[in-house]
Regions:
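Membrane-helix interface segments
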Residues: 10-11, 47-49, 78-87, 117-119, ...
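Membrane-water interface at transmembrane helix exits
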Residues: 29, 40, 69, 73-77, ...
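A short amphipathic helical element positioned immediately N-terminal to and/or at the very start
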Residues: 37-45, 213-226
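Hydrophobic alpha-helical transmembrane segments
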Residues: 51-55, 82, 86, 123, ...
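Transmembrane helix-loop-helix hairpins in multi-pass inner-membrane proteins
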Residues: 1-41, 92-204, 282, 286-345
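Membrane-embedded helical hairpins/re-entrant loop segments and their flanking transmembrane helices
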Residues: 64-94, 252-269
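Membrane-interface helix starts
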Residues: 13-16, 45-53, 222-236
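Transmembrane helical segments that form the transport core of multi-pass membrane transport proteins
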Residues: 221-272, 280
Length: 345
């Protein structure tokens, strides 16, 4: 795997991405203009401590992602520290936004390569981290659905009735991704299918690259999945990360005094919201979440209320997190400048 796969975002691309982010934010604010009075009134009710509590829960997400990276990378680099894991988490969050969703893994690979992890294993481990995340999202939403399916069926109308269909489509995609990582049978099937690519130089080069990535992924998945205690730790951290994220809308609703929805009901709705957002297009993590949030929570809150909750939710889970990741990213660069890369263990 070439070192081109691991890179830092350039200043030019970062500036363009920030302008796109600003434009998207302006579009979202414009769509909220008819309910701006309700939104500002709801936000004005919040105390300083309530705002700080919501922001703290939002910041916990990238911190726990860093903990997951720490646990995963230590399977290859036993000397990999928690601080370095947090650096990887910040690099992923920052890279995902400033490259409009395309650069989280390359930025993480750049950091991991600098601390001594070869690019191939690094790419395999970061892909497996993504697979663990998607698997946990699927399991979390499935458990919530099984426990509260009767309540959801009795309280959904309109487009929400299509939610099971969307769930099934996304579930199939996630299961296929998991099987590609862990099943030798599916990996062999993928190799066979790649043989049908056009016999041109361009496509054959792509085929060679994909086969190399598939081989690395197969090797790293066997190594990681053989360590059952480590896998359980990863799943536990992923579940805790999602639990905190799914608590955010409940805190927003409660602090604003907007709805009688119960804690576990909001957990269900938020897990489904995140699940549905995976099937929607997004730019730098924006667009899909907002659409899915309005779709899911719009059946349980008034229009102005759901927009108020969405506004605070995105401030805590996206904008403040991105601002923190910018600081974390530059601190990570300082850490790299202060160390010599260790040898692989």
């Amino acid at each position: 795997m070439s070192q081109a796969a691991a890179q830092q975002p350039s200043r030019k691309k970062t500036a363009i991405s920030l302008l796109v982010l600003l434009a998207l934010t302006c579009i979202i604010v414009f769509t909220f203009k008819d309910h701006w009075a309700e939104i500002t009134a709801a936000l004005a009710q919040l105390s300083v401590w309530q705002v700080l509590a919501v922001l703290a829960v939002g910041i916990s997400y990238p911190l726990l992602e860093g903990c997951v990276a720490w646990v995963i990378v230590r399977s290859r680099l036993p000397q990999f520290t928690l601080r370095q894991g947090l650096d990887v988490g910040w690099c992923g969050t920052f890279g995902n936004v400033v490259t409009l969703g395309a650069g989280a893994v390359p930025v993480q690979l750049y950091y991991l390569h600098k601390v001594g992890l070869p690019l191939g294993p690094g790419a395999g481990l970061m892909t497996l981290e993504y697979v663990f995340h998607k698997s946990t999202v699927l399991l979390y939403a499935t458990v919530m659905l099984l426990l509260q399916r009767r309540w959801l069926a009795a309280n959904t109308t309109g487009v929400m009735r299509y939610l099971p269909m969307a769930y099934a489509v996304v579930a199939v995609i996630i299961v296929a991704l998991v099987l590609l990582c862990v099943s030798p049978l599916v990996q062999n099937l993928a190799r066979w299918l790649l043989g049908f690519l056009p016999k041109t130089e361009k496509w054959q080069q792509r085929r060679a690259d994909w086969l190399e990535q598939l081989e690395v992924l197969s090797t790293e998945s066997r190594r990681l999945l053989a360590d059952k205690p480590r896998c359980l730790k990863i799943f536990a951290l992923q579940a805790l990360k999602l639990f905190g994220l799914f608590c955010l809308p409940y805190l927003c609703i409660r602090f604003m005094g907007l709805s009688p929805l119960g804690f576990w009901q909001v957990q269900l709705l938020t897990s489904l919201m995140l699940f549905v957002s995976n099937a929607l297009p997004n730019v730098a993590g924006m667009g899909s979440i907002e659409t899915a949030f309005l779709l899911v929570f719009g059946s349980f809150l008034e229009r102005g209320e759901v927009m108020s909750v969405l506004m605070l939710y995105r401030i805590a889970s996206y904008y403040v997190v991105f601002a923190a990741s910018a600081v974390g990213f530059f601190i990570a660069q300082r850490h790299l400048a202060q160390m010599e890369p260790p040898k692989e263990g």
